[in-house]
């Protein structure tokens, strides 16, 4: 790994951190160390990093802003690439927006609303990066990324980079082709929006933000929604009806505000969260005969 670190630093790809605690890079403030964490300064730096990784046959993992993510306590071996400030560009051309995978979804939604561009009102208050939103087809309030994405620049597992159209992304509820059939990460996205009355867009976004603040634990460290909604049921409602709000294992606690959120109540480990998830799944299965599948991405070394 020393040679990998040396080459990455020589190429000046951006920040290169050794044995970096990933709890510093996740919204739930949980996660063991990455052998090496690279925060690339631009897309070329991502390409250069991948060349080094492939040359040495080192395992690699990519993360965004750390929302909707649970990193296990043992951390992640190999190189972790964090898409952040180096990939946070945005260009507007009429009703089309090109945006980097590291760009904040909240910042994007707010910025385009001020330009009178509609299509991302649903994203008001959604934490995380554009790359992560594309990866999991993030959504709320009856809409999602698939409704506005034209194409996405994807870095695949084998290190190749290519554009995929909306159709090729094979979007469905909180899912894209990147999660299983063609594992990869989004470096850049092109979105098709619609010019509308600015005041109406801003008002709708504020309404969505207020709803999120009133119903979700935005002030506590959490990873976002833990479970996918087992349609037509809602995960949070099932957890609440089962009397599990406030249930705690170790430092992990089911939010008192919303049943589909687990918060870090202090000193929580990934094991605490996993044990709590398993307890919820078992309880819901026994009470309602419904299987609860996780929406949060769980990555890292298993003991």
Curated annotation (Swiss-Prot):
Single GO BP term: cell division
Reaction(s) this enzyme catalyzes, per UniProt: UDP-N-acetyl-alpha-D-muramate + NADP(+) = UDP-N-acetyl-3-O-(1-carboxyvinyl)-alpha-D-glucosamine + NADPH + H(+)
Source organism, top-level taxon: Bacteria
EC code(s) of this entry: 1.3.1.98
Location within or outside the cell: Cytoplasm
Nucleotide-binding keyword on record: no
Primary residence: cytoplasm
GO molecular function, one term: UDP-N-acetylmuramate dehydrogenase activity
Residues covered by the FAD-binding PCMH-type domain: 29-196
Active site (record annotation): 174, 225, 295
Enzyme superclass (EC): oxidoreductase
This protein's UniProt keywords: Cell cycle, Cell division, Cell shape, Cell wall biogenesis/degradation, Cytoplasm, FAD, Flavoprotein, NADP, Oxidoreductase, Peptidoglycan synthesis
Protein role: Cell wall formation.
HAMAP family, A to Z: MurB
Protein name according to UniProt: UDP-N-acetylenolpyruvoylglucosamine reductase
